[in-house]
Amino acid sequence: MSGKARASRKKPQQVKRSLKQRANKEADLPENEVGNTAKRNRSHAKHLSSKVTGQATYVHLKRVKISSSKRTTWQPLPKDTEEYLQSMMESVILGILFNIKRKEEIQCHLNQLKKRLLQQCATLKVPPRKLNYLKDVSKMLKMEKAQERANEESLASLQEEIDKIVETTESMTESIQSLKNKIQILTSEVEEEEQEVKQVFHIDSNKVLALPELSQKSLKAPILQEEILALIPNQNALLKDLDVLHDSAPVKNVSAFIEEAYKKLDS
């Protein structure tokens, strides 16, 4: 079992070494021979991979030959593309360094790679852009300007609403403070009046009025009606006449009229 395992381990290592040697040889060959050797290597790699791993799914880049006359029209890489690449690399670096604790060395290494790539991009020449996308630029610009105006209007309306809310809040705060001051003044006045009432009416701690007692003479004094009747010589005849007047129709009509008048006044 151990001999078979060693043999199975040696096979992929030998395959890797042979592929590396072939790649190094291709680097020294001209373009025509490189294309032919690349074709042979593809078929050979597929054959070896099917034998060793059983998988033959590879992604191969297609080489396109460009004449030197076409390369004369090439231009350096645009600045906006460089800026886009720089921003994209910075965001990728931040995403990589987010969950790493000791990230000083890694950050320095990634920044060096970014610097080298940007230096290569600065000297790189690319085919000129196709200007088909410029047809809709004016339309898109109008749409963006309209959206910007709408956003500015909404921001202005929101600012006005915020200013109104702030003003109402400040006025409410001032009114609340003035009401608190009035309440304090009124409570102090009520306390002073209570003290004065206690002093005037001699109210003790149990809130009982310390009024003087009534004299016995005031309790035994005659009623006012008795005093008036004592001045009249014929009291019984006067009382009978008063009863007759009270039961008469004119007096009843007058009393009914007075009651109706009071009812109307109350309503």
UniProtKB/Swiss-Prot annotation:
Chief localization: nucleus
Taxonomic classification: Eukaryota, Metazoa, Chordata, Craniata, Vertebrata
Positions of modified residues (Phosphoserine): 49
Biased composition range(s): Basic residues: 1-22, 39-49
Entry keywords, A to Z: Centromere, Chromosome, Coiled coil, Nucleus, Phosphoprotein
InterPro entries linked: CAD_CENP-Q
Family of this protein: Belongs to the CENP-Q/OKP1 family.
Keyword Nucleus: yes
The protein, known as: Centromere protein Q
Posttranslational modification: Phosphorylation at Ser-49 is essential for CENPE recruitment to kinetochores and orderly chromosome congression.
Region feature Disordered, mapped onto this chain: 1-54
Function of the protein: Component of the CENPA-CAD (nucleosome distal) complex, a complex recruited to centromeres which is involved in assembly of kinetochore proteins, mitotic progression and chromosome segregation. May be involved in incorporation of newly synthesized CENPA into centromeres via its interaction with the CENPA-NAC complex. Plays an important role in chromosome congression and in the recruitment of CENP-O complex (which comprises CENPO, CENPP, CENPQ and CENPU), CENPE and PLK1 to the kinetochores.
Subunit (UniProt): Component of the CENPA-CAD complex, composed of CENPI, CENPK, CENPL, CENPO, CENPP, CENPQ, CENPR and CENPS. The CENPA-CAD complex interacts with the CENPA-NAC complex, at least composed of CENPA, CENPC, CENPH, CENPM, CENPN, CENPT and CENPU.
GO CC, one annotated term: inner kinetochore
Protein's gene: Cenpq
Organism expressing this protein natively: Mus musculus
Subcellular locations according to the entry: Nucleus; Chromosome, Centromere
Xref: Pfam families: CENP-Q
Keyword Coiled coil annotated: yes
One of the protein's GO biological processes: chromosome segregation
